[in-house]
Amino acid sequence: MHAKIMDALGSLPSDLASAVKPIFEDANFDATLSPEQFTTLLSTTHMTDSELRVALLPIAAAYSVAPISKFFVGAIVRGESGRLYFGANMEFVGASLSQTIHAEQSAISHAWIKGETGITDITINYSPCGHCRQFMNELTTAKTLIVQLPEREEQTLQQYLPESFGPADLNITDALLGKIDHGMTIKETDEFVAIACKAANGSHAPYTKNYSGVALKATDGKVFTGKYAENAAFNPSLPPLQVALVNMNMAGYALTEIAEAALVEKADSTISHLSDTQTTLEALNPDIPLTYVAA
């Protein structure tokens, strides 16, 4: 079990800690809770749905990588499938602050990479910043998304972001987490690069058409993917590398275990992720080889 999760267990109510420990000790635990597991925890602890989600936030925050701020934030989103996904903020020493991943972005992209097509609610340690409110406004469920904070009544995202600006204002009907396949192909025969291309085909980039995906290979051969999550307000967009880093972190891997990376993006786009991807990987480890393909 992740050492930080063990530490976080000590901050939970004793009955909850006892109930969740076997789940976290399971070798197949992937930083998610199935609907059945969550229902069992509700029955065992006699907590309400929102109380249980808030009580589990220290576990989500245990995944935080915050060497700069030392401000550890956790988030839990529930997909339309009923499964709960943990997420946490991530910061990178030596990279610009624009490369930072917020906890809300982490949990949402975690759910996205595992196949969810909608989010019903999100539970967070602290009130979501404007950046994250805008990021969430890109979701397929932005109009109905519920936000839960500790010791607060739940509110909708639209209450946190009144008179919001979103995809519809730019005449865009696609939304983040929507099912899509851009049909990009590459001449490369390398399987690792092909995995990055597959991720690019599921990316959300209706504004620039920069369909892009990243694959990261760990030292043990495990591969993690990320796909670009673009935003109507541009700046809150989440690059494909960041989504892959979330995927890797939530699987319990340290970022020092990255052995290889690949970036595939649309060749005729008005933007490129190459420079930022190179710079951030360089900050993590200058020896990580990066394969780049413009399709």
Swiss-Prot record:
Its cofactor is Zn(2+). Binds 1 zinc ion. It catalyses: cytidine + H2O + H(+) = uridine + NH4(+); 2'-deoxycytidine + H2O + H(+) = 2'-deoxyuridine + NH4(+). Its EC number is 3.5.4.5. Zn(2+) binds at H102, C129, C132. It holds the Pfam family dCMP_cyt_deam_1. It is an enzyme of class 3 (hydrolase). The active site is at E104 (proton donor). This enzyme scavenges exogenous and endogenous cytidine and 2'-deoxycytidine for UMP synthesis. HAMAP family: Cyt_deam. This is Cytidine deaminase. It comes from Photobacterium profundum (strain SS9).
